[in-house]
Amino acid sequence: LTCKTCPFTTCPNSESCPGGQSICYQRKWEEHHGERIERRCVANCPAFGSHDTSLLCCTRDNCN
């Protein structure tokens, strides 16, 4: 599986997930400087946090 890895809306960077991590993840939240984005490979989809504005977990290449 290959997942996007950069903290921007448009994300050209991706990486192959290590063994045991078969989910692509994207989390967005608001900070005083604007929207923040985190993208990476994970083993389990995390819980939706109280400050999150969106949370995406998917299992196709570059789906995050």
Curated annotation (Swiss-Prot):
Query: What function does this protein fulfil?
Result: Allosteric modulator of the GABA(A) receptor (GABR), possibly increasing receptor affinity for the agonist, thus enhancing receptor opening and macroscopic desensitization. In vivo, intracerebroventricular injection into mice results in periods of reduced basal activity, followed by bursts of intense seizures and death.
| Statement: the UniProt record of this protein carries the keyword Disulfide bond | yes
Annotated family: Belongs to the three-finger toxin family. Ancestral subfamily.
Q: Where is the signal peptide?
A: none
User: Which tissues and organs express this gene's product?
Assistant: Expressed by the venom gland.
What Pfam family does this protein match (any one)? Toxin_cobra-type
Q: What is the effect of changing residue 33 to S?
A: Loss of activity
Native species? Micrurus mipartitus (Red-tailed coral snake)
Q: Which UniProt keywords apply?
A: Chloride channel impairing toxin, Disulfide bond, Ion channel impairing toxin, Neurotoxin, Secreted, Toxin
Disulfide bridge positions per record: 3-24, 6-11, 17-41, 45-57, 58-63
A GO molecular function annotation here is: ion channel regulator activity
What InterPro entries does this protein's entry cite?
A: Snake_3FTx (IPR003571), Snake_toxin-like_sf (IPR045860), Toxin_cobra-type (IPR054131)
State the compartments where it is located.
Answer: Secreted
- Protein name, as recorded: Micrurotoxin 2
One GO cellular component assignment for this chain's record is: extracellular region
State the source organism's domain of life. Eukaryota
Q: What else is known?
A: Negative results: does not bind to nicotinic acetylcholine receptors (nAChR), muscarinic acetylcholine receptors (mAChR), acetylcholinesterase (AChE) or to receptors for glycine and glutamate.
